[in-house]
C-alpha cells in the first residue's frame, strides 16, 4: 500500500504513529529472541508514560473533536485507547501482555492512519488543523511528547 499523504498540520501527530509501530517491531523482535518479558514490559511502560499518554491526549482533545463524540470512528478509537492502557499497566502475565500490546497497538495505529486520520483530513477546517498542530507543539515544547 502506498504511503498516505497527510496534511502538513497533521504530519507531526501522524509521525508519532511510526514510533508506536517501531515499539511493536521491537516487541516482536524481543519475543522472537526470547528476551526477558519483564524488561520488555518496563520498556513498554516507559514508552506509554513518555509518548503514548500525550499522544492519546492530543488525539482526544484536538483530533477526535473534528468528527464529534458520536462518530463511530471516534467511538472505536476511544475504546481502542482504553485497551492498550490496561495492557501497558498490567504485569500479571508479561509475555501474553507483550504479544497483545504488539498486535492491538499495531492494528489500532493502522486503523487511525488508514481510516480515522484520513476522514479527519477530509472534513477538518484549517482552524481545526491549526489547533491540532498548536496543541502538539505545546506538548512537544514541554518535552511531554
Give residue ranges: language-model regions:
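Small-residue-biased structural context
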Residues: 1-145
Amino acid at each position: 500500500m502506498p504511503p498516505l499523504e497527510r496534511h502538513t498540520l497533521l504530519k507531526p501527530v501522524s509521525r508519532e504513529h511510526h514510533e508506536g509501530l517501531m515499539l511493536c517491531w521491537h516487541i516482536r523482535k524481543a519475543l522472537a529472541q526470547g528476551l526477558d518479558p519483564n524488561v520488555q514490559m518496563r520498556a513498554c511502560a516507559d514508552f506509554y508514560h513518555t509518548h503514548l499518554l500525550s499522544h492519546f491526549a492530543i488525539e482526544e482533545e484536538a483530533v477526535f473533536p473534528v468528527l464529534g463524540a458520536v462518530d463511530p470512528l471516534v467511538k472505536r478509537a476511544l475504546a481502542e485507547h482504553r485497551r492498550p492502557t490496561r495492557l501497558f499497566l498490567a504485569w500479571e502475565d508479561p509475555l501474553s501482555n507483550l504479544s497483545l500490546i504488539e498486535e492491538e497497538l499495531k492494528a489500532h495505529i493502522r486503523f487511525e492512519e488508514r481510516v480515522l486520520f484520513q476522514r479527519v483530513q477530509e472534513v477538518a477546517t484549517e482552524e481545526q488543523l491549526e489547533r491540532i498542530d498548536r496543541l502538539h507543539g505545546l506538548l512537544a515544547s514541554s518535552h511531554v511528547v
